[in-house]
């Protein structure tokens, strides 16, 4: 089965594998000697990402859409909802990220790093709510954190923080401009 970006359906859950933002954080601190130890750790996420091929194969049996997070989840999720002709609610406080980022990235740049940065190569996928136990099973089977970060709506892309609607203007990474 081939997973496309265009299959998301109203009320599907939105998930992401792994943690986001580490590759972008590595780029943000690479020249800052204060964070040389952290950069040494984070650069592996930038230079040697782990492709999620096996879990992608398993997801193809039930997920409704999927995309690799290469341009930042903000931009990649926009691709899913655009091609699926729907919207999404994203709960920013649910998005998993390496807690080291709290120490090295200024608070006002944290979301840009976590959802606007690219090169994570995790998977963002949608699935019918009835498959939530199967998602948990795949997380254990592949020893990969899978986190529900939102749900598909009829229209618009909305971001929430602590259950409050907030305005974000993140473009994500563009390989042709950056």
Q: Residues of each region from the PLM?
A:
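Glycine-rich anion-binding loops of enzyme active sites
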Residues: 1-29, 147-151
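Glycine-/charge-enriched secondary-structure boundary and capping motifs
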Residues: 61-62, 66-178
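Short beta-strand-to-turn element immediately C-terminal to the catalytic PLP-Schiff-base lysine
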Residues: 17, 28-31, 126-127, 160-161
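Internal active-site segments that recognize and position negatively charged phosphoryl groups
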Residues: 15-18, 49-73
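A short, charged helix-loop
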Residues: 26-29, 33-50
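Active-site-proximal beta-alpha loop/turn segments in soluble metabolic enzymes
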Residues: 23, 37-41, 62, 120
């Amino acid at each position: 089965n081939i997973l496309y970006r265009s299959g998301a359906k109203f009320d599907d859950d939105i998930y992401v594998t792994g943690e986001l933002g580490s590759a972008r954080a590595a780029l943000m601190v690479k020249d800052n000697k204060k964070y040389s130890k952290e950069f040494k750790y984070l650069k592996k996420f930038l230079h040697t990402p782990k492709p999620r091929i096996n879990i992608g194969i398993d997801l193809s049996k039930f997920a409704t859409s999927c995309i690799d997070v290469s341009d930042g989840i903000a931009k990649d999720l926009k691709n899913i909802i655009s091609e699926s002709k729907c919207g999404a609610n994203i709960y920013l406080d649910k998005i998993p990220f390496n807690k080291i980022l709290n120490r090295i990235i200024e608070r006002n740049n944290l979301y840009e790093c976590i959802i606007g940065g690219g090169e994570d190569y995790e998977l963002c996928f949608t699935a019918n709510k009835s498959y939530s136990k199967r998602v948990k099973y795949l997380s254990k089977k592949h020893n990969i954190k899978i986190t529900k970060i939102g749900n598909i709506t009829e229209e618009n892309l909305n971001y929430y923080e602590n259950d409050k609607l907030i305005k974000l203007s993140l473009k994500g990474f563009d390989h042709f401009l950056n």
